[in-house]
From Swiss-Prot, chains A, B, C:
Residues 35-61, 108-124, 171-178, 241-251, 304, 368-393 are extracellular. It is found in: Cell membrane; Basolateral cell membrane. It is a multi-pass membrane protein. The chain crosses the membrane at residues 14-34, 62-82, 87-107, 125-145, 150-170, 179-201, 220-240, 252-272, 283-303, 305-325, 347-367, 394-414. This is Ammonium transporter Rh type B. GO terms for biological process: ammonium homeostasis; ammonium transmembrane transport; transepithelial ammonium transport. Keywords: Ammonia transport, Cell membrane, Glycoprotein, Membrane, Transmembrane, Transmembrane helix, Transport. One of its GO terms (cellular component) is spectrin-associated cytoskeleton. N-glycosylated. One of its GO terms (molecular function) is ankyrin binding. It comes from Oryctolagus cuniculus. Residues 416-424 are annotated as: Interaction with ANK3.
Amino acid sequence: MAKSPRRVAGRRLLLPLLCLFFQGATAILFAIFVRYDQQTDAALWHGGNHSNADNEFYFRYPSFQDVHAMVFVGFGFLMVFLQRYGYSSLGFTFLLGAFALQWATLVQGFLHSFHGGHIHVGMESLINADFCAGAVLISFGAVLGKTGPAQLLLMALLEVALFGLNEFVLLCLLGVRDAGGSMTIHTFGAYFGLVLSRVLYRPHLEKSQHRQGSVYHSDLFAMIGTIFLWIFWPSFNSALTSRGDGQPRTALNTYYSLTASTLSTFALSALVGKDGRLDMVHVQNAALAGGVVVGTASEMMLTPFGALAAGCLAGAISTLGYKFFTPILESKLKIQDTCGVHNLHGMPGVLGALLGALMTGLTTHEAYGDGLQSVFPLIAEGQRSATSQAIYQLFGLSVTLLFASAGGVLGGLLLKLPFLDAPPDSQCYEDQMCWEVPGEHGYEAQEALRVEEPDTEA
Amino acid sequence: MAKSPRRVAGRRLLLPLLCLFFQGATAILFAIFVRYDQQTDAALWHGGNHSNADNEFYFRYPSFQDVHAMVFVGFGFLMVFLQRYGYSSLGFTFLLGAFALQWATLVQGFLHSFHGGHIHVGMESLINADFCAGAVLISFGAVLGKTGPAQLLLMALLEVALFGLNEFVLLCLLGVRDAGGSMTIHTFGAYFGLVLSRVLYRPHLEKSQHRQGSVYHSDLFAMIGTIFLWIFWPSFNSALTSRGDGQPRTALNTYYSLTASTLSTFALSALVGKDGRLDMVHVQNAALAGGVVVGTASEMMLTPFGALAAGCLAGAISTLGYKFFTPILESKLKIQDTCGVHNLHGMPGVLGALLGALMTGLTTHEAYGDGLQSVFPLIAEGQRSATSQAIYQLFGLSVTLLFASAGGVLGGLLLKLPFLDAPPDSQCYEDQMCWEVPGEHGYEAQEALRVEEPDTEA
Amino acid sequence: MAKSPRRVAGRRLLLPLLCLFFQGATAILFAIFVRYDQQTDAALWHGGNHSNADNEFYFRYPSFQDVHAMVFVGFGFLMVFLQRYGYSSLGFTFLLGAFALQWATLVQGFLHSFHGGHIHVGMESLINADFCAGAVLISFGAVLGKTGPAQLLLMALLEVALFGLNEFVLLCLLGVRDAGGSMTIHTFGAYFGLVLSRVLYRPHLEKSQHRQGSVYHSDLFAMIGTIFLWIFWPSFNSALTSRGDGQPRTALNTYYSLTASTLSTFALSALVGKDGRLDMVHVQNAALAGGVVVGTASEMMLTPFGALAAGCLAGAISTLGYKFFTPILESKLKIQDTCGVHNLHGMPGVLGALLGALMTGLTTHEAYGDGLQSVFPLIAEGQRSATSQAIYQLFGLSVTLLFASAGGVLGGLLLKLPFLDAPPDSQCYEDQMCWEVPGEHGYEAQEALRVEEPDTEA
């Protein structure tokens, strides 16, 4: 509890300096490189020959807002389940997310839309940046409660760069399809975070064990996150799929997959629960696995039945993961996975990549007709067979796992830098480390109430 | 408290088996019957001659997402007002809703869009399935806290089938108009639930009375539900009304009606409250009656004034219902209506059906011009006079009340099956029946805190 | 605590009578004056020659729903941070908002769209009414906890009228640009509320000081408000900007500005916090200043860098305002600003107006091309130079400050009317004044638990 004055002074300056330095650096890079794209710039748009209704905005904006809500409301509140870590869960989600959006704009811009010395940003950039922020927040879930904000900012710095690189290799170099990011977002974010958590392994974390669970209200707050993720996931997967049939098909597949993962989660949770009781952790997380598992395949001709089957399987695996695999992960593999991202994003993400490869291999010209061009342009143009595209999909998964693991190791070593002010083992999962905390746990407001009480009794 | 081992074993298997059986059955039926519709299928869409912007998706998707949010966030959190039943309220909303979406897709598909041996699903199917899930959750509100999850799944099984049948009779056979579902959703859902609750009457429910109220925080959670329902209701009523003028008119009428029901709710709540105090129950529920009461009429030329008048009346009746009618309902009619669905959905739903009939009877060619075709095709085509259409509307209300009541009786008898594991009278409104519950009410986390305290004092 | 029976009787009638009178009056005015506009009326729409996709609804509705969510979910929950005032914060937001929407429709209708003896309402009217309700809720933030519902309704009555007038002078008479309302909404709402709070100065407010802070859970509820405001702010600023490039550019600028204000808020909060700790009040509020500061300039060619710079500055100023300026505001200027609206809406609003004037002065034909017409029609048509338009912008700010201050004084005097039942100094920030409050603070539910306990122990 007692801190050296120097350490306190260090912390006082560390976070402000990092924030201001990062903000300053991205602002300078924005000034030099970032410009409005043709849909967003007044002169360029009006120079073109199109009706206002053709603007990308009207095809993407409602989905963008849903994705934005998922990243900040969804991931943010999902992590409020911890009893004394709600400020940090929401606050650091906010901080990491905001930084990731700026930095991802630059990284993705340099790799995807750098023309004539400039990055051109528009609706798609915003959605892509939100996707990247989503991956960062998935990794945050693995190390939640055991890392300080300065560590997390450095994690985001590294992860966004590697995310952009991995995405570039998959989508641009390998021609892999991954509209909803089973690989690029979920698998990458999960294994990056898990490997990082392994490097940061804390053998004496049991000192904070009493804060690692939820309380009644914190579980209700977490359900805000769950439900917003669940309802908006169809927008997440379809935000960048092709206009016309692509967006509704993706949304519809995701919708049905999620209903199935919900049913299988309840079934398995009751089956493995003590006295047949349901477990809130399963409902909060595993019910969402249906969205992850169709991240790659939902834009394909998966069929509504295929969506149900995939969701059902993902919900079951995820629930069993929480029950049986998470404890082993900690005891045997020394991976402390606070939110169970391995169960929600890791395994369902890999499963989603495999499902995507399977659906790709089964692609026929009959099933897609003239729509093949927008889902599998390389097959439609005769450059690849369905089988070879499927092999590329599997190769994309391997590349992702490689990037994520290497990044996690690198990130872990980076975060071990001693001046980054990691919380001690006994102060994990505790908002007081970084926040002024009022009431209920014995602070100002509580004091005031204590002072008041004698008056009432007198 | 003490349970026979056999009962526990039964429960352990009952819910998993039901979930898996239902999921398996719908999956098989999906595999056989459900196909993408022309807007969603790659080959069919690209075979047609249309621009991508014509896809139904761009006219319906934002409204669909709002409806989806209302059903899961809105209805879910609205029921969290009970102090010890938040997990169940949110969890069973999730479970029932997910199952209802799948099952409604099949039932509505067989009745509405079964062509060439297949059900064709697209944006409208998703919205219709959400509407049906909404009706199931209204019924859930009537029996909240007094039923287990297995009972609720069976209720949903029956209710979805009857909902689809009633909807088919009204919209397809009788040619009744009911865009926002004053009859098909609210009246049906409410009276189905109320009659079912009557059949399940518990004379000794006072044993759980101390859990039947709210606590401070649970009321704030419930307000999440209220406000999301309130803001998105314009989308609920307009999600399936005609393109062009139909959607904005419906949304606008609903918007104004809700402002009026809010004002009249506050007025009446303070008027009948102890010492002029406002009651959160009224604000959480009756303020929404304005959305219900224009469910039928909001697509019509109701005029903004008509919307205000209807909303004002609905808010007042609903508030008075909570104050004076709910107690009578329990004491005289033996209907225990946990959420007061009779006040929010029952009476305003019937009132909405009557308002719809009135507006229908007042329809003129002058008021609608060439727009008459899309609101009242049968009148526009000269097959019916306005008066005869109005009589059909009233007949639709009667049919709905009949289906709902018969369904409620049937459902009540079904849910009385002894192996369905209903909670005992003393354990109603209690999450512990079905959930692992941490903290605050004396479980693990609390234990940990107690252990910790001596350390702090030492 | 003891009240005279007459006072209680007065209160019992005051709020109901005000609500019903206001509702009755607006309903009558709606009946006489308000009609559907050409996009919403069946006959008028079908009389025109356009495709359904041209309807304003499809360009504005998704943004409208986001704005609606911001006003009721965002502003509502943001004010739940007070430990014992959650019912009032949410309930009065609801009441004031609903009344403001109706009354603003009339006021703005008379001033902006009164043709042929009628006000014509459609999508834009709904958005404009929501904007006005937003301003009323900003003022509510300044007097939160110190005013009763009857006082607040009268405040809304006056403020909506003056808001409409100020907006009319700026947008219609002076030709000022202010799409996201840095002046018309934020500056106006903040200074109206602050001056009003000054007139209502309570020298003995410390009697309620122990209720003026937050508790752990109330801060989490407030974050619901913060995050929904943050994610949907791009829709707020772009809801009424021009079709085509205008809406995406405005949304994009707002998005980046908010990321920057979030980073600078965290930096400054940690810098000025005790032991380098972060303060939830800053994160809840100052992180949003980026949305306010680009309210005027976001539709202009601000550039992504400009958005970052503006947001960064606004977040920093707002955080420093909470830390250093709010205490002075109370001690020296006798302005008790409950939510710190001066920091979130006042200073960033004025800054936003200045930024707007700067960007206006820098306008060139090259930067906007043919798009100049839709952002600065008077410059495009040659009626004004960029400099003279910039001077008009500054003049608009002065007019706004004048209207707001005069309105605040007038409002303060009005709210001092003794029969309006203001809460006594010792009962401020306390829900019990106006609401039936259960549990946790020693009411019914708590009683029930006490009764139960002996049974358990016996």
